Amino acid sequence: MPKVALYNQNGSTAGDIELNASVFGIEPNESVVFDAILMQRASLRQGSHKVKNRSEVRGGGRKPWRQKGTGRARQGSIRSPQWRGGGVVFGPTPRSYSYKLPKKVRRLAIKSVLSSKVNDNNIIVLEDLTLDTVKTKEMAAILKGLSVEKKALIVTADANEAVSLSARNIPGVTVVQANGINVLDVVNHEKLLITKAAVEKVEEVLA
């Protein structure tokens, strides 16, 4: 079982903690991680693109000239696709780009990225993370004490308003709950700060 240091929020070591090998100690599967990221990014697409076809463009109800005798090509509407200002043929319409991977694949992906963080020594397990008041300066001091200088994902066991509000103005820092941890967030942040209680929740779900 992988063993990592356990820290308190002052940045001091408070011992070690053994992580579940089936969650934090597997061989990362890069292909599955790639598929999971594609799925998440597809779900983030707005999909509100829209163009008008010939029936939706304003005007064009009258035949521009008679069928025969003018020497010009026959036309039925000035909103036909070949006209300037006409409708678009087979243009984009509003749609959802989201799709779902199988549950086992999604679980393997999140286990893979968590294991990668352990392998790269980019995971910091905290005994607890509590703030009495909303104070960005205090949160910044905690991160500095833990030598977190780049993008960091903070994972708490439950909703913690003081932590979330204190961290939201710090560039590159994101706070999520254990039940909302996802592949894209973990990959997009160099450091993973997770509380001991959150580790237990993640292991309970994924082990």
UniProtKB/Swiss-Prot annotation:
Q: Name one GO cellular component term.
A: ribonucleoprotein complex
UniProt cross-references to SUPFAM superfamilies, sorted A to Z: Ribosomal protein L4
For bias type Basic residues, the affected ranges are 60-71
> GO:BP terms for this protein?
translation
Looking at the record, which segments are called Disordered?
Answer: 48-89
Q: Which GO terms describe its molecular function?
A: rRNA binding; structural constituent of ribosome
Q: Keyword set for this entry?
A: Ribonucleoprotein, Ribosomal protein, RNA-binding, rRNA-binding
Family designation: Belongs to the universal ribosomal protein uL4 family.
Q: Assembly and partners?
A: Part of the 50S ribosomal subunit.
> What is its biological role?
One of the primary rRNA binding proteins, this protein initially binds near the 5'-end of the 23S rRNA. It is important during the early stages of 50S assembly. It makes multiple contacts with different domains of the 23S rRNA in the assembled 50S subunit and ribosome. Forms part of the polypeptide exit tunnel.
Task: Report what the protein is called.
Answer: Large ribosomal subunit protein uL4
Gene name, Swiss-Prot/TrEMBL: rplD
